[in-house]
């Protein structure tokens, strides 16, 4: 289902090639530590008694939503992304999942209080709408790249570097939800083949700004297997009565 408006920013949507690269990366298990952390966050005992779906905002192909639903067998999942290629794949990520093509910068097409968990991994954040859709006692799980993330690739492959103000901007975007933010950092080492390095670059925001021939030449100059740092920050916020009253 597509709910994109006439003037929606589809130019920012992931391409079919980006989605395919992401699926190959996950198929190799390169982000398994993060997938495990998301599963643990969704099965947090504090969520017992909180009714609602697992909603993945900026879901991509639904690979994190799939792990979340495996960890929460009593819940359904909803993937929302502005890429039709991502949504098609996300709709098939799990038998209890559905997908909607929509721009999460606009009004999220869900009832107020209908989400027990909202996932937001490497995606834009709409704090006001997240606050509205999240049920009382529900959890928001945000994943952002850490300062060391893929540091060995940024300069040689002309990748976009991590924003040094990302944490500050996260707090600003979340509004009252930021008051309950709990943060942890996950780091692990990857030993990568040439094809895996290429896919890590091509699945992300750097893909659209690379010259194909220069990228191939840069890949050739690296030595494999290449040791690369993966570093992500997992932040969890709980919607409390205080955050609700602050929002109103």
Where are these regions (language model features)?
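Conserved class I S-adenosyl-L-methionine
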Residues: 49-60, 139-169
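Conserved Class I S-adenosyl-L-methionine
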Residues: 184-248
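A short acidic, Gly/Pro-enriched loop at the edge of an enzyme's catalytic core
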Residues: 105-117
């Amino acid at each position: 289902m597509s709910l994109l408006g006439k003037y929606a920013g589809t130019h920012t949507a992931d391409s079919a090639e980006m989605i395919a690269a992401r699926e190959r990366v996950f198929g190799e298990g390169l982000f398994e530590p993060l997938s495990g952390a998301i599963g643990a966050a969704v099965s947090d005992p504090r969520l017992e008694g909180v009714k609602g779906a697992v909603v993945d905002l900026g879901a991509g192909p639904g690979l994190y939503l799939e792990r979340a639903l495996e960890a929460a067998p009593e819940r359904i999942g909803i993937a929302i992304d502005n890429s039709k290629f991502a949504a098609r794949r996300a709709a098939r990520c799990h038998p209890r999942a559905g997908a909607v093509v929509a721009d999460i910068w606009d009004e999220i097409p869900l009832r107020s209080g209908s989400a027990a968990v909202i996932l937001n991994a490497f995606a834009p954040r709409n704090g006001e709408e997240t606050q509205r859709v999240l049920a009382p006692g529900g959890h928001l799980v945000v994943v952002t790249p850490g300062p060391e993330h893929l540091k060995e690739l940024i300069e040689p492959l002309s990748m976009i570097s991590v924003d040094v103000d990302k944490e500050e901007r996260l707090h600003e975007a979340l509004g009252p939800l930021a008051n309950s933010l709990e943060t942890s950092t996950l780091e692990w080492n990857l030993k990568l083949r040439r094809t895996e390095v290429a896919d890590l670059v091509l699945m992300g925001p750097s893909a659209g700004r690379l010259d194909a021939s220069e990228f191939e030449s840069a890949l050739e100059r690296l030595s494999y297997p290449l040791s690369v740092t993966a570093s992500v920050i997992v932040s969890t916020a709980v919607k409390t009565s205080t955050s609700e009253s602050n929002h109103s």
